[in-house]
Amino acid sequence: MAFYTSVNRYGNSILYRGYNDNGVAINDRIKFKPKLYAPVDADSPLKSFFGQNVKEIQFDSMGDAKEYVGMYDGADNYQIHGTTNYIHQFITDKFPKDISFNINHINVVNFDIEVASDDGFPTPEAAAYPVISIALKSSQSSVYQVWGLGEYDHEKCEVDMRGDLIQYHKCSCEEELLAKFIGYWSKNYPDVITGWNSRFFDIPYLVNRIRIIAGEEYVNKLSPWKQINTRKQTIMGREQVGYELVGIQQADYLELFKKFGYSYGMQESYKLDHIGYVVLGDNKLSYEEHGSLHTLYKNDHQKFID
């Protein structure tokens, strides 16, 4: 069965990503012609929610529909019916029946970045420190893709990979690391991206760092539609800034755990190491002998990548 993974609006176009009946990925820019309903005096087979006679009006574009609604805004004797959320209208028109989503087709990418932080805590707003590694794993692949700046031998990996493999991309500098990552990403756009606190750290840090190093053109390549939207949210009195990579859904594991992991109760810490132990009985690979992650990076790059 066909289904969608993302539907966005850009001007008079619908930006559609999904899968067809054969499980083939679809990326389509569609000129959508919405419908609204206006009152009529004559008897009509079409009725409003309140039983009023209405007629269907199809517009050439979403912009035309918006202009029409604006003309009658505040007119008590001429009420326009139908949804002006044209994304919802598009989805309803395309999928009039229940949608069967096939999880086996959906490409979910788990990713994580590491940042050099030898003289302070890196903040995504400033993105002042270099990105020194990026790792990702697609649900459609058994291979971890890792970009780093030092030597790494996957055959010496200390972590139980449970049959998965590691493809390591050694880079000579941060600029090369970001360029190679963007090159891979733009050829393998996922449907969903996830990580631990990825919405308010990994993604905004990466967006802002790429903007500093390479410019807006390369930032836009993070989206299959070459569009990045800023999203602000106030959490515990503090404004957090995230970015929507248009065409890719975000499912932050930290947010999901706080929302759906209530059976574990309140936690003393929401760091990944602690939650991993609470849920799975496993901690992250220990590097306490090095004191800090930055010292580990400097002294044992092999274990740092692990």
Task: Annotate the PLM regions.
Residues 1-306:
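The two-metal-ion catalytic cores of nucleic-acid processing enzymes
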